[in-house]
Amino acid sequence: MNLRPEEISSVIKKQIENYKSELETVSVGTVLDVGDGIAHVYGLDEVMASELLEFPNGVYGMALNLEEDSVGCVLLGDETRVKEGDTVKRTGRVVEVPVGEELLGRIVNSLGQPLDGKGQISVDKYRPVESPAPSVVDRKPVDTPLQTGLKAIDSMIPIGRGQRELIIGDRQTGKTAIAVDTIINQKDQDVICIYVAIGQKASTVAQIAERLKEHGAMDYTVIVSASASEPAPLQYIAPYAGCAIGEYFMYEKNRDVLVVYDDLSKHAVAYRSMSLLLRRPPGREAYPGDVFYLHSRLLERAARLNEDMGGGSLTALPIIETQAGDVSAYIPTNVISITDGQIYLESELFFAGVRPAINVGISVSRVGGAAQTKAMKKVAGTLRLDLSQYRELEAFAQFGSDLDKATQRRLERGERIVEVLKQPQYTPMDMEDQVMIIYTVVNGHLDDIPVDNIERFEDEFLSYIHSNYPEIPETIKKTGDLDDETEEKLTGVIKEFKENFNVKENTLLNVEEGDTGEEENNEGHNKAEQDTEEKDTEEVV
């Protein structure tokens, strides 16, 4: 084989001519130490705050502490896959979540990865979990009601679309129940719902998903779950991820969105543990100094957009758990000051059988009144006052002093109002039905109905009116008002129904009669004892 040097040299020359020097610069760092979900990385001089960092073995982290000679970052995955000396790369982007219609009906984690075993979610759109809140000029006042389907809330603590209403109370007082009922009530209301579970038990989230599925609510709902077993960083970004998913529908689809954060107490605890591990100085109750900003920047993203921005809205229902009813603790006071009102649930009311256990005295909606329908505003105007007076008189009545007739009437009316406002779970009520039954109790039409017949009266009355006079609820629904003609017709129907209503004897009367018999027996027994004592005395004498 003859080798021709000139051919070889020409090939080499060609390759040298075509060679282009391309240097790829990658900003990398080295893991100094790792533990408790936190990694300290040397290098990465140009890293951004909250930037996503890539660790080996498919683990990602988020840069939170930008120190002089190292970067403190939290790991969004299994820390056992990261070891000292590993190389860390910058990604040049912040933490993002997938968004889109494809997420509806799914359960995802804080990074938008599916948890429900229904396969991968194929989306082509992503949004950063942290984004600025709409400015003042982008917003408009809250003017449309968001119906919860709960009589006590829609009548006295109305919520508007774009509002932030806090649900606060001790554990096991029905906070999540109110939020879930509100989601169920958005069926056919054209509202997208996002339920964010932070630090909840996985079994609880599965139960809620099952309930929503039973009532056909998963079709318009996304569940974002960062359960108690997830690392603190994933619990920390969960509410922001849920908000980002909601913002996609608000900004790009001009839809109305409802986001439930359940609950922000556990969110603050997760952030506290991260901050302490990052050696940030602790403040009150060991929370870091920026814990107020943690929640304010999240809840400020709720808004009612003006027409130029598409007219969508994002309503936030944050939940806070109190310890022994203490609303003056650090996190509760922070969130109360950020939100547009609060629904306060009391364990005493809950155990007394008043459910939802709302304490109307300290519950308030600061902007929702403007969004309330005219019909509801008209019938529920005196409801809060009547209920407050009843609670006050009830406290006095416990002393057993003689009450005048006016006070007695108020107490009886109050008992009936409390009974009407009770509502079983998963049974939200339409606005027109709420208006009709509240009108009935406020105007004294139930004053002569025994308290234990009220629930039956309500069910039978509403089915009677829908069967025989469907035009009344239809008019209220269509106009959102209770005009004089409809009111007159409604009063006539109430009287007509009451004539045919079969009042069942109060079962308490039988118990009282039994008690009376017992008292008589006791009197006889006491008299016999007295006679015996007298006889003994005579014998002694």
Swiss-Prot record:
Spans annotated as Disordered: 506-541
Gene3D superfamilies from the UniProt entry: 2.40.30.20, ATP synthase alpha/beta chain, C-terminal domain (1.20.150.20), P-loop containing nucleotide triphosphate hydrolases (3.40.50.300)
Reactions it catalyzes: ATP + H2O + 4 H(+)(in) = ADP + phosphate + 5 H(+)(out)
Biased composition (Acidic residues): 512-521, 531-541
Cross-referenced PROSITE patterns: ATPASE_ALPHA_BETA
Residues annotated as binding ATP: G169, D170, R171, Q172, T173, G174, K175, T176
Pfam families noted in UniProt: ATP-synt_ab, ATP-synt_ab_C, ATP-synt_ab_N
Subunit structure: F-type ATPases have 2 components, CF(1) - the catalytic core - and CF(0) - the membrane proton channel. CF(1) has five subunits: alpha(3), beta(3), gamma(1), delta(1), epsilon(1). CF(0) has three main subunits: a(1), b(2) and c(9-12). The alpha and beta chains form an alternating ring which encloses part of the gamma chain. CF(1) is attached to CF(0) by a central stalk formed by the gamma and epsilon chains, while a peripheral stalk is formed by the delta and b chains.
NCBIfam families, per the entry: atpA, PRK13343.1
Similarity comment text for this entry: Belongs to the ATPase alpha/beta chains family.
UniProt xrefs under HAMAP family: ATP_synth_alpha_bact
Protein's name in the database: ATP synthase subunit alpha
Species name: Halothermothrix orenii (strain H 168 / OCM 544 / DSM 9562)
